[in-house]
Amino acid sequence: MDERNPRDDVARKVELSWLMAFYGGMLTDKQREVLTLHCEEDLSLGEIAQEAGVSRQGVHDMLSRAAQKLFDMEARLGVADRFSRMQHGLEACRDALRQKRYDEAEQLLNQLIALDQEDDHGL
């Protein structure tokens, strides 16, 4: 019996969709199609298998390989994480400015500039 939490499945699908926005171009067309059907259209493995003309096991294997590729790309490059940190920093800076906390806004802006200038991954 499958003991996975449905919330974990939803969280994983959301994370994979997020990573596809950054690294989807690194997947094959078939991997991208299967991931889109699974994560964004919420189709079951059986439904995807029928639509794609492959076995359920084939869909499972393709999803596993595609997900692993996305996670590996993010582990190596960190583009999605960096984008998220920038976005949150910008929102915090904007909020500080709106509330006239100028010293805090300046500190946040300096942190954003430092983040922008990071070159940890050779980008």
List each language-model region with its residue ranges.
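Hydrophobic positions on the alpha-helical face of helix-turn-helix-like DNA-binding modules
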Residues: 48-49, 59
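Pre-recognition alpha-helix immediately N-terminal to the DNA-recognition helix
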Residues: 18, 32-33, 92
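Short amphipathic alpha helix immediately N-terminal
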Residues: 29-41
